[in-house]
Amino acid sequence: NIIDVPCRPCYYRDSSGNCVYDQLGCGA
């Protein structure tokens, strides 16, 4: 199994598996 490494704080993983900055989820 491939372990999915969590994205950095304030980032989320999109449907393509990329870590994308999450403006809404980061202490707005």
Swiss-Prot record:
Q: List all disulphide bridges recorded for this chain.
A: C7-C19, C10-C26
Any idea which GO molecular function terms this record carries? potassium channel regulator activity; toxin activity
Q: Does the keyword Signal apply?
A: no
Keywords from UniProt, A to Z, are: Disulfide bond, Ion channel impairing toxin, Nematocyst, Potassium channel impairing toxin, Secreted, Toxin, Voltage-gated potassium channel impairing toxin
> According to its record, what are the GO cellular component terms?
extracellular region; nematocyst
**What subcellular compartments does it reside in?**
Secreted; Nematocyst
Main subcellular localization, coarse class?
A: secreted
Which domain of life does the UniProt lineage start with? Eukaryota
Instruction: Give the matching CDD domains.
Output: Ugr_9a-1-like
| Function according to Swiss-Prot or TrEMBL | Possible voltage-gated potassium channel (Kv) blocker. Increases amplitude and duration of crab leg nerve compound action potential.
Q: Of which family is this protein a member?
A: Belongs to the sea anemone BBH family.
Q: What is this protein called?
A: Toxin Bcg III 23.41
